[in-house]
Design a protein with these regions (language model features):
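Membrane-interface loop-to-helix entry segments
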Residues: 23-30, 34-47, 169-175, 181-231, ...
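Extracellular loop-to-transmembrane helix junctions
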Residues: 9-48, 90-128, 304-312, 413-423
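N-terminal alpha-helical transmembrane segments of multi-pass membrane transport
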Residues: 1-79, 89-96, 428-472
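Transmembrane helix-loop junctions in multi-pass membrane proteins
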Residues: 4, 34-39, 80-85, 161-172, ...
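Extracellular/periplasmic helix-exit of transmembrane alpha-helices
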Residues: 114-122, 223-241, 249, 255, ...
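Flexible loop linkers connecting adjacent transmembrane helices
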Residues: 37-64, 87-89, 93-97, 109-142, ...
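Alpha-helical membrane segments and immediately flanking helix-loop junctions
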Residues: 57-91, 117-135, 139, 256-303
């Protein structure tokens, strides 16, 4: 096992340190330029669409645009937003934060494209809901069913099973450290609560995340604001340090400027998931009048994840001054030490509570992606979905009590392949998202407040099964 873990880790180092960074950043820049900075010029529209979607009621089993946004944010905003950012600062220096911001800006364009495509090629269900994602547009638009099936299997295993076990493991370790609670007890509680949420189906998951995500992110950002206000005199110096170290040859341990850039880009990509092919699964479920609406909303999710939540961790760590570049104190422990310097002995419990919210929301969001891709195989029997739910609950229990280094490395490997497959698809299908964007803007320029999508504007209607058509 140790040999296998070493081999997988070496492959991951090459894949995530070089290949994927080049492809993800390159495609992000391409989408940014070709959409004429859609993530910047339509930022007010993103905010309008998101705020208009809050509290929107949908009929039957349909999912609102805000609920779909909350599901994807639940998956995005996980333990990595606390531990990952702390690790980035220790290994890449404060300058890594700047490069996380940059990659988030670029990734917004990629997120827009993949989510818009997911909406264009979504499939309707008899109960009035929708489902879709990369597996669906790979099959229906690229007409490569074999690749689509492989993608569906990989994302179901990676997100639905492996990532759920990793998040459960983090919750159990945090509870044991802060409250001396046995991992077995934590496993039992997690199994029960996970079952209650996921067995209620897509609509219950959407309602659960719609309730939890704003509270979860809001509380954490509030803590960061309190610390920022308490250290307001240090803020100009902190921002100057971030900018200076982002371009300083001595910025980080073991690689200087290159290390700062590489670390920031890697952590940014891991956190916001733009281009990885996960978020489109949630985007496709939204009931909207135009695909671009959900593309813009999901694009804004990248800002929320990195510019708000990840920045909150960065400010907490940098303003409290508990970090040492290249030091042993890192990850969750560094976040706890940073909060303890402000709030005292209450900090471990507070961090444990935040981890519980972040990690459990990720479990629910990750399961959601798995369920959507299980549905891709169109089995009339519910046995497959029942088995998948049972496996998810089992992996939550297993993850709470296991060492998961090999499992985590395998998940990263699978995610790398998912990412490359999705980028291949969205680059080839980009013209459809671009035409949809132009259609949306033309209607807005004519004074139409809520544009309606007409698939006839696309170069081809092949593979579209919603939007009033059903063509092969």
């Amino acid at each position: 096992m140790e040999l296998l873990n070493t081999i997988v880790n070496e492959i991951n180092n090459i894949l995530w340190s070089y290949v994927l960074i080049i492809v993800l950043v390159g495609s992000g820049i391409y989408f940014t330029l070709s959409t004429r900075f859609v993530q910047l010029r339509l930022l007010p529209e993103m905010i309008r669409l998101l705020t208009d979607g809050v509290g929107t009621k949908t009929e039957g089993h349909a999912v609102s645009s805000f609920q779909a946004f909350c599901v994807s944010t639940a998956s995005r905003v996980g333990v990595g937003n606390i531990a990952g950012v702390a690790i980035a600062i220790v290994t890449g220096g404060p300058g890594a934060v700047f490069w996380m911001w940059v990659i988030a800006f670029i990734g917004c364009a990629t997120g827009f494209v993949e989510s818009t495509l997911a909406q264009i090629y979504k499939l309707p269900r008899k109960n009035g809901s929708f489902h879709g994602g990369p597996a669906y547009y790979i099959k229906n638009a690229l007409h490569q069913p074999g690749v689509a099936k492989l993608f569906a299997i990989l994302i179901s295993v990676t997100f639905g099973l492996i990532y759920c076990s990793v998040q459960a493991n983090t919750i159990a370790l945090s509870a044991q450290t802060a409250f001396n609670i046995s991992p077995a007890i934590t496993a039992g509680f997690l199994a029960v609560f996970t079952a209650l949420v996921i067995c209620g189906g897509v609509k219950r998951i959407a309602r659960f995340t719609e309730f939890l995500v704003p509270i979860m992110a809001g509380l954490y950002i509030l803590v960061a604001i309190i610390i920022t206000v308490m250290n307001i005199d240090k803020v100009p110096g902190m921002l100057a340090l971030i900018i200076h170290d982002a371009f300083s040859p001595q910025a980080a341990v073991g690689g200087g400027l290159g290390s700062a850039i590489l670390t920031g880009v890697k952590r940014g990509l891991f956190s916001n998931e733009a281009g990885e092919g996960s978020v489109p699964n949630a985007a496709a479920t939204a009931d909207v009048t135009h695909p671009v609406k959900q593309g813009l909303i999901q694009s804004f999710g990248v800002y929320v994840d990195t510019w708000l939540v990840c920045s909150a961790t960065a400010f907490i760590v940098l303003l409290t001054g508990q970090y040492t570049i290249g030091g042993e104190l890192t990850g969750i422990a560094l976040a706890q030490a940073s909060l303890a310097s402000i709030f005292g002995g209450f900090a471990p419990a507070a961090v444990s509570f935040m981890i519980l919210m972040f990690a459990f929301s990720s479990i629910v969001g990750n399961y959601y992606y798995g369920e959507i891709n299980i549905a891709f195989f169109e089995s009339k029997s519910k046995a497959g979905l029942f088995l998948f739910r049972a496996l998810v609950i089992f992996m939550v229990v297993f993850g709470s009590m296991a060492e998961l280094s090999l499992v985590w490395n395998l998940a990263d490997l699978f995610m790398g392949f998912l990412c490359l497959t999705n980028l291949y698809a969205i680059i080839r299908l980009y013209k459809y998202a671009h035409v949809a964007l132009n259609s949306y803007l033309e209607q807005k320029n004519k004074g139409i407040a809520e544009p309606v999508f007409d698939p006839s504007v696309l170069p081809s209607e092949s593979g579209i099964h919603a939007w009033g058509v059903d063509k092969d």
